[in-house]
Amino acid sequence: MADVTIRNLNFAYEKREILKDINLSYELRDFLAIFGPNGGGKSTLLKLLLGLLRPSSGTIEIVGRSPALARAQMGYVPQFIAINKSFPISVLEVVLMGLIDKKIFGFYSKSEREQAMQALERVGMQSLAG
């Protein structure tokens, strides 16, 4: 059984079809590249996988669960974020920005900070947390 399975996935913004009949399965340790032209639906597909959007039809399963239920086990680093690049920011704060359930004004719980530190530890970057 694949860790991520997408079956007959369709998605439309209003009446504009963005993704049509997507079928895909892969194991979590596999490498996967998603590429295509601007407006081709790459970011939309990622948002569907994260449970930030709901498909018009079809199913997505991540380790046998819906994206909403699997969300706590996923991380996401957006391509663009709205920050002033000259403003000092720590590595830990950058990791916290990747939380799916973002906080207003950057107030994160102790649990969220611990979760971010664990993520940094998994990739050997805890000493850079700041």
Residues covered by each model-derived region:
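ABC nucleotide-binding domain signature
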Residues: A33, A72-Q79, L92, L96
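The feature captures the beta-strand-to-loop junction immediately N-terminal to the Walker
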Residues: F35-P37
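Conserved ABC ATPase "signature" region
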Residues: K110-A129
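Helix-to-loop junction immediately C-terminal to a conserved catalytic motif
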Residues: L50
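Conserved structural motif at the start of ABC-family nucleotide-binding domains
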Residues: V4-I6, I18-D21
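Conserved ABC transporter NBD signature motif
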Residues: G58-A70, R122
